[in-house]
Every structure is written in C-alpha cells, then in structure tokens.
Amino acid sequence: MTTPAVKTGLFVGLNKGHVVTRRELAPRPNSRKGKTSKRTIFIRKLIREVAGMAPYEKRITELLKVGKDKRALKVAKRKLGTHKRAKRKREEMSSVLRKMRSLGGAAAAEKKM
C-alpha cells in the first residue's frame, strides 16, 4: 500500500479531512515475521557443521552431482511434503555443492604445494 496523500483541510474530495501531522509509530513485532535473526542463522550453521547432512540430503546432493535435478526435486518433495519446500531444499543443496567445489579446488591446490 502507498502512503496516503496529505489532507487538504477541505471537507470534499479525495484528500478531505482535518490537517494533522502523522505520528511515527515503532514497527510492530509481527512485521518481522519470516525473517531469521542473526543468532538463528549462526546456530543453524553451527548445527549443520557439527551434525552434517541427513541421509536424504546426501542423496539429493548425489543426484545433483550427476545432473539429475528433476529426480532430486522429486526426492525432496517426497521427504518434505510441498513443492515449494522441495525447490528451496534443492537450491540449498546445490549451493552447498558449489561451496564444496570451490573449497575443494583451493584444498587440492594446497595439498600439491
């Protein structure tokens, strides 16, 4: 929604009404719904580092390695329940794979030295 136009002081027209200064209100708590906090992101990252991946996540990464994106999506959908969650999981796993490849290349270069 756009911000309403300034009132004109007239009692007719689109912007009719008494002229007042709008109060600046603090943001409501539910306006941040769906946004993960820095702490939550840190904790999830830490848990992922310690616990590793679930078996179905490992299978998805294996399917993505051989280029079977559609099969990976189907596996994720069956495990997670909805198409939207499955797509998000597939993207997450492919980004993990990309990071592993980029780090793997750097690690291989260090081993050669």
UniProtKB/Swiss-Prot annotation:
GO terms, molecular function:
structural constituent of ribosome
The biased composition feature labelled Basic residues covers: 78-88
Q: Which residues form the signal peptide?
A: none
What biological process terms from GO does the record include? translation
InterPro entries on file: Ribosomal_eL36, Ribosomal_eL36_sf
* Gene3D superfamilies reported in the protein's UniProt record: 60S ribosomal protein L36
Pfam name, any one: Ribosomal_L36e
- Location of the region described as Disordered in the Swiss-Prot/TrEMBL record: 78-113
Q: Which domain of life is it from?
A: Eukaryota
Q: Which family does it belong to?
A: Belongs to the eukaryotic ribosomal protein eL36 family.
The protein, known as: Large ribosomal subunit protein eL36z
Which source organism does the UniProt entry give? Arabidopsis thaliana (Mouse-ear cress)
The gene name reads RPL36A
